[in-house]
Amino acid sequence: MRTCKNGNSYEAANKLFTVRHDGTRRGGTDEKGSHWHGEQVMNYLMDRENSKDTDPFLIYYGFSHPHDVRDGKPELLKKYGAVNHLDPNILPPANPRQPPLPVNWLPEHPFDHGHTTVRDEVGVKGVWKKRDERTIRNEMGREFACSENIDIQIGRVLRKLEEMGELDHTYVIYTADHGMAIGRHGLQGKQNLYEHTWRIPFIVKGPG
């Protein structure tokens, strides 16, 4: 089975999955955010359990966060001192609980790298063209909130696999397609060749 955001997957590959769930948008609620993806996987595992299905399985768990728009859940945003900022005419509130600025933060990129006007650099809700400290720290808090929600949803699935007796013989692979600048080098998006963009996690856990 697989989950993904509608429009962000490859149809030829989708046809190989017998169970497919597409989220229609990213959001900061359980109905539209990472919890929704987790719920689809949990339902799939419970269906396997109830039907006593012992065939091998593949789950592609395709979260759409922390890609923008990084609308986090209220309780996680509060933990990281962030808000889902909506007004491009004012700065988000400062909060000491927000993550610090990245060590390589810059207020602007020092040269035109060829992608300074793409949507990722000028049109992301909550940041737009701003690179000031308050905006970037708030956006980092939103990213942390969205990333922690992914941790929570993966934890739900791992506990369910353990409860079913499946975890010890299941390979779990955690990776991503790209990173994101969020103020590093004065950039916001992914259209660049800095390490913060092309370096991604790759974690494998399983038997053997």
Feature names for model-found ranges:
Residues 1-2, 6, 11-25:
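Active-site segment of extracytoplasmic enzymes that catalyze sulfate/phosphate-ester chemistry
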Residues 24-31, 35, 44-208:
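Active-site-proximal cap/lid insertion segments
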